[in-house]
């Protein structure tokens, strides 16, 4: 997942707004302990900025369908600003499953992400790649992990902190379309100590 942005710090829905890392978010990142040739990112600058610090020198390839969910009219706002908004309250009361006004449903978003994610895993395995690195968004992680990760857990369980993620094993992917969780990772300077 990308590093901290001002919207993250203010608990605002970012969605597909192109919000950069905040100075504190950039300062807390540290270089990862692996050196992939290629890192898959989204067109949003916060993923590129994070990848440039974590994986310097890697070729960065944008995958549009890995972008965060489009939260429509909720983007740029936080809960406090919307606590009396009937559209927001209806969406929250529907477990965030209904469409966001001018945005996506969680189901449409998850399908988009999982299709793109699976295509990358399929291609990496077909090409004999040892490592596949994807640096995207919290929602992207949650959608892919809910669908493909073992042990199974619900969508919100998989919300990693900023600059956090998962290391997965694809040994059973070809036959079962599952990935086994090996460990979580956190690429901030505090976690390096």
Predicted segments with their positions:
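Phosphate-handling substructures
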Residues: 54-112
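Conserved histidine-centered catalytic loops in small-molecule metabolism enzymes
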Residues: 35-65, 90, 146, 169-193
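Active-site-proximal alpha-helix that buttresses catalytic centers in soluble enzyme cores
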Residues: 1-58
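Generic beta-sheet signal
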Residues: 37, 128-138
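Short hydrophobic/aromatic-enriched beta-strand-loop microsegments
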Residues: 20, 58-65, 152-161
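Short beta-strand scaffold positions
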Residues: 41-42, 111, 135-136
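Short active-site segment of divalent metal-dependent hydrolases/proteases
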Residues: 5, 140-141
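Domain-level recognition of soluble alpha/beta enzyme cores
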Residues: 151-178
